[in-house]
């Protein structure tokens, strides 16, 4: 009887040990996925904030009451080399290893299409996949519509909307609204010299998605096919401008604060093994960030139209061009 009890205990302890080992392996896999997600997606979400910060203010001048502008804009973001790639080594991972190497350089979401294989063993089954590609674009261009309406007392309301812009490995969309107030109206000395002073605050929502990892295992699909980031950003802009005949030259200082939210999703036609688990871990990557940038804008008025070009600079460089029509 004693021998039988000991035998049963040995069998049960084996099952418990195996379960603990499998749980540990899954934990290591999720930890590695979180590490890679951070390095891969954060440069793109930081860039999205800069794109959404550009060219909100059409003029630092006081807008006439009920005057309405409607414009078509194109935003051009220049992807810096430093944010296109990152280095990994086997010491960075607990579950995976780089196939055939100890170190490698891989693309971020903003990078090229170079790939390496990562391999791991989950309960005796090999998991092997290529690292995700980047968008492989040196510039990111997206169009959007922007409208503004003059309100009483030197206020102006602005709205912005872009359709979902397709990237090579994902898509991007932004919308938002803002409120501007002109302060130079209170200083006759500034107005007499055609110098304008305004402050504007804006809210924007940016959503950026990328193809991430499509990995099938005996346990099902990992459920990491798409990586999506939603960013809520509040912008604050102080602008000074000078009128020179039909031109207005605007210089601005912009500060913004952003809250980041991340989510992965799988292929709905297949079972997703780790989708829920990794989504529970992704809040560890979420952060609140402040950014500061400068902006130079040139505006040229002709008839009821005006053309505008804005150059935003700081951590990133962004160019914005637009043509607007004014309805008095």
Q: Where do the language-model regions lie?
A:
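Residues on the lipid-exposed face of transmembrane beta-strands in outer-membrane beta-barrel proteins
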Residues: 59-61, 70-72, 145-151, 177-183, ...
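Extracellular/periplasm-exposed beta-strand and loop segments of Gram-negative cell-envelope proteins
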Residues: 83-85, 121-137, 166-172, 205-233, ...
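Short loop/turn motifs that connect adjacent beta-strands in outer-membrane beta-barrel proteins
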Residues: 58-66, 81, 169, 184-197, ...
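Bacterial Sec-dependent N-terminal signal peptides
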Residues: 1-24
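Transmembrane beta-strands of outer-membrane beta-barrel pores
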Residues: 74-78, 161-165, 183, 201-207, ...
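Outer-membrane beta-barrel biogenesis signature
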Residues: 19-118, 192
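Repeated loop/turn-to-beta-strand initiation elements of outer-membrane beta-barrel proteins
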Residues: 154-157, 186-189, 246-249, 302-309, ...
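Residues that define the transmembrane beta-barrel architecture of outer-membrane proteins
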Residues: 64-66, 138-143, 171-177, 193, ...
